[in-house]
A protein has these predicted regions:
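HEAT/HEAT-like alpha-solenoid repeats
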Residues: 13-24, 47-58, 80-94, 119-127
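Structural detector for internal amphipathic alpha-helices that build alpha-solenoid repeat scaffolds
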Residues: 1-8, 20-42, 51-54, 61-76, ...
Length: 144
C-alpha cells in the first residue's frame, strides 16, 4: 500500500522550485499543490502564492490559475490580494473572464472573510455599478 500524502509534513522546497518554472503546466500543478498545503496548516505555501501574484501580474492566464490557488489560503492577506485585483485590472471584455475568476476565488474564502471583502467592494463608488451590484449579490448569497 502506498503511503498517504500529508501536506502538513511534505517537504515544500521541491514544490517551490516547480512553482517558479517557466513551463506553465509544471508551475500550475505546483500552484495547485501549494493551495492545498495552504489550506492544511501550511501558511508559508499561501504566502508564496501571494508573492507569485506580484511576479505574474501581467499574465492574466497564469493569474487565473494563481487566484484559484490563493482561494485555498484562508487569510486576510488572501482576501486583500484578491480585492486588490479589482482595482489593478481594468474591467473590459478582454479582462472579464479573469475578473470573474477573481470573484469566484473570493467567494471560496471562508464566509466571514469573503463577506467582509465583498461588502467593502460593493460600497466602493470607484468601481462600476455593474461590479458593485455583483459584489452585493455575492455577499447576499453567502448569507444564504
Amino acid at each position: 500500500m502506498a503511503p498517504e500524502f500529508d501536506s502538513r509534513t511534505f517537504p515544500i522546497e521541491p514544490i517551490l522550485r516547480q512553482a517558479v518554472s517557466l513551463v506553465a503546466d509544471r508551475a500550475r500543478v505546483a500552484w495547485t499543490l501549494l493551495g492545498t498545503m495552504a489550506r492544511n496548516d501550511r501558511p508559508e505555501a499561501g504566502i508564496f502564492l501571494l508573492g507569485l501574484m506580484r511576479v505574474h501580474g501581467g499574465d492574466l492566464t497564469r493569474m487565473a490559475t494563481l487566484v484559484r490557488a490563493v482561494s485555498f489560503f484562508p487569510s486576510e492577506a488572501a482576501a486583500e490580494a484578491l480585492k486588490a485585483e479589482f482595482y489593478r485590472v481594468p474591467s473590459s471584455p478582454a479582462t472579464r473572464t479573469y475578473l470573474n475568476e477573481v470573484l469566484r476565488a473570493l467567494i471560496q474564502l471562508p464566509a466571514p472573510l469573503s463577506r467582509k471583502t465583498l461588502t467593502t467592494l460593493a460600497e466602493d463608488k470607484k468601481l462600476s455599478v455593474k461590479w458593485r451590484r455583483r459584489f452585493e449579490e455575492s455577499a447576499w448569497r453567502l448569507d444564504g
